[in-house]
Amino acid sequence: MAERRVPFSLLRGPSWDPFRDWYPAHSRLFDQAFGLPRLPEEWSQWLSHSGWPGYVRALPAAAIEGPAYNRALSRQLSSGVSEIQQTADRWRVSLDVNHFAPEELTVKTKDGVVEITGKHEERQDEHGYISRCFTRKYTLPPGVDPTLVSSSLSPEGTLTVEAPLPKSATQSAEITIPVTFQARAQLGGPEAGKSEQPENK
């Protein structure tokens, strides 16, 4: 099976901005965007000329430059991405769960489906209180033994769930049949090979 990526993200797109006269003095309050980085400059310029005045505010240069923005954008683009791989002998799913501790993650199998759940209770951050939860389900390939499914969490926050594929699915269906050699059978039984002798009188 070919590699398949399943990204998801949230798009910011307010159709109007009642606080544009208040910006940028209080921009920090309204531009938190719940952890999402601002739109890249070229998107902002395109949207501001799209015929929808006020659709997107002009962004200050500081908002789109610098390592902090690059790190935030990199994290957002890499967050929440699920990657499924299937090799000749293994099936594997990798999922970015960097916001969750190991004890906040649950991996279980039921009816040929792997279910990954993450949840942490409400906690305080620099902007207030936040809670997160998610559930992802993946169908196991036919014949996979659910008791052999294993999972591991990397220090970078990548959860890997994998299982060996059954032998019947990984081995070729081609079977070599040995050829045995037999001498040609003699017709008429063992006595047929004897030449008949004329009877002497």
From Swiss-Prot:
One of its GO terms (cellular component) is nucleus. Phosphorylated upon exposure to protein kinase C activators and heat shock. Phosphorylation by MAPKAPK2 and MAPKAPK3 in response to stress dissociates HSPB1 from large small heat-shock protein (sHsps) oligomers and impairs its chaperone activity and ability to protect against oxidative stress effectively. Phosphorylation by MAPKAPK5 in response to PKA stimulation induces F-actin rearrangement. GO terms for molecular function: identical protein binding; protein folding chaperone; protein homodimerization activity; protein kinase C binding; protein kinase C inhibitor activity; RNA polymerase II-specific DNA-binding transcription factor binding; unfolded protein binding. It comes from the Eukaryota. The modification N6-acetyllysine is found at K119. The modification Phosphothreonine is found at T170. The modification Phosphoserine is found at S15, S27, S74, S78, S79, S82, S94, S172, S195. The modification Omega-N-methylarginine is found at R12. It is found in: Cytoplasm; Nucleus; Cytoplasm, Cytoskeleton, Spindle. GO terms for biological process: anterograde axonal protein transport; cellular response to vascular endothelial growth factor stimulus; chaperone-mediated protein folding; intracellular signal transduction; negative regulation of apoptotic process; negative regulation of oxidative stress-induced intrinsic apoptotic signaling pathway; negative regulation of protein kinase C signaling; positive regulation of angiogenesis. Homooligomer. Homodimer; becomes monomeric upon activation. Heterooligomer; with HSPB6. Associates with alpha- and beta-tubulin. Interacts with TGFB1I1. Interacts with CRYAB. Interacts with HSPB8. Interacts with HSPBAP1. Belongs to the small heat shock protein (HSP20) family. Small heat shock protein which functions as a molecular chaperone probably maintaining denatured proteins in a folding-competent state. Plays a role in stress resistance and actin organization. Through its molecular chaperone activity may regulate numerous biological processes including the phosphorylation and the axonal transport of neurofilament proteins. This is Heat shock protein beta-1.
